[in-house]
Amino acid sequence: MSIGTDAETKKKIIAEYAKTEGDTGSPEVQIALLSHRISHLTEHLKQHKHDHHSRRGLLLLVGQRRRLLNYLQKTEIERYRSIVERLGLRR
C-alpha cells in the first residue's frame, strides 16, 4: 500500500469537487485531496505507530486543510458548510 494518492483516484476526486472543467485549484478540490491524503496517512499510522516522520507530515496536511477551511469560512460561508457536510468533517 502506497501512502500517496494515485493519479486515477486524484482525477476522480477532482472531477467530483471541481466547480468547472479543469478546476484543480479551488479550495473545495484542495480540501478534498488533502482529506483523502489525511485519511490514508491516518490508516498508515494505525499500523506503524512509531513512524514519527509520517506523523509530522500528517500534522502539516491537517494544518494546511485547516487554513483552507478557515479561508473558505471567512469568504464564502455557504461553500464552507457544503464542503464540511460533503466530506463529513467535524467542526
Curated annotation (Swiss-Prot):
Keyword RNA-binding attributed: yes
Name this protein carries in UniProt: Small ribosomal subunit protein uS15
Family designation: Belongs to the universal ribosomal protein uS15 family.
Keywords, sorted A to Z: Ribonucleoprotein, Ribosomal protein, RNA-binding, rRNA-binding
GO cellular component, one term: cytosolic small ribosomal subunit
Domain of life: Bacteria
GO BP, one annotated term: translation
Coiled coil, from the record: none
Species in which this protein is naturally found: Nocardioides sp. (strain ATCC BAA-499 / JS614)
Functional summary from the UniProt entry: One of the primary rRNA binding proteins, it binds directly to 16S rRNA where it helps nucleate assembly of the platform of the 30S subunit by binding and bridging several RNA helices of the 16S rRNA.
Gene3D superfamilies per record: 6.10.250.3130, S15/NS1, RNA-binding (1.10.287.10)
Assembly behavior: Part of the 30S ribosomal subunit. Forms a bridge to the 50S subunit in the 70S ribosome, contacting the 23S rRNA.
Pfam families (alphabetical): Ribosomal_S15 (PF00312)
GO molecular function, one term: structural constituent of ribosome
